[in-house]
Amino acid sequence: MHGLTGSGIVMADSQTKAGLRRVAVAIGLMMLIAGRPAAQAPGLGSSAELIDPKTFRVCADPRNLPFSDEAGEGFENKLAELFARKLGEPTNYTYLPQVVGFVRNTLNALRCDVIMGVAVGDDLVQTTNPYYHTTYALVFKPNTGLDGIESLEDPRLKGKHIGVVAGTPPATVLVQQGLMALARPYALTVDTRVEAPTQEMANDIAAGQIDAGVLWGPIAGYYARRVSPQLVVAPLLKEPERMDFRIAMGVRRSDQDWKRRLNRLIAESQPEIDGILAEYGVPLLDEQGHLTPPP
């Protein structure tokens, strides 16, 4: 099972088993936090619903753009606002860096009722239906001879200095292709209040310190627009290793009715969800894994 780290990046299987998180995948993208699998109040059975009936309570990272921040500028913030508005409720946030212990100290401690941006299949929370599907992408400066690349197996990458986040699926492929000797690793799990390794990678590409980088799709699309020159984002659609993941919301295992309610919200709101994601440059895939045009 793959998972999302604290910076929203989907990470490799061995890291998931180690109990690391995220990632709004995650995206990082199944949340990798050590914690109990479900939260229950004393004396309540496993069927008890523990949802605040009047407030859409979200747990998120305080400084993890493009996913979330305390100013509400991330796309997960915007999606939470959308869902809360449709429920006729205000939003309330509990912010905590998404590192080891995040689920235990937030959702399972009853400090919120939903975590945005969890990879489908996360075994630490119950996931809703997915509300978007995306993939890792290669990011590079324009006019560098890398246009049209869809796989890290492309021979044009031989001899290139490529940035990669340690412990993620692309790192495995770089090793398999003999590209790690010249690669530059960036940290996987960090305190986002003081470090921003994925933003650093985008800056390094723009400055010519590395030739290209592999980033989780939402991060690639966001930071590619925020450097000069703007970078090309090439989704990796033809990899031997899995690079694409479906992203959902995470809730407590006991909250079955709440999950069904959120599933209905997702189904009713999909065009609006896609519009918000497009504003942030998130590359979106259809059910067959094909890139979809922006709405």
Q: Which residues does each PLM region occupy?
A:
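Extracytoplasmic small-molecule ligand-binding "clamshell" domains
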Residues: A41-D123, T192-E195, E279-Y280
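Bilobed "Venus flytrap"/periplasmic-binding protein-like clamshell domains
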Residues: R57, P62-P66, E70-R85, L138-P197, ...
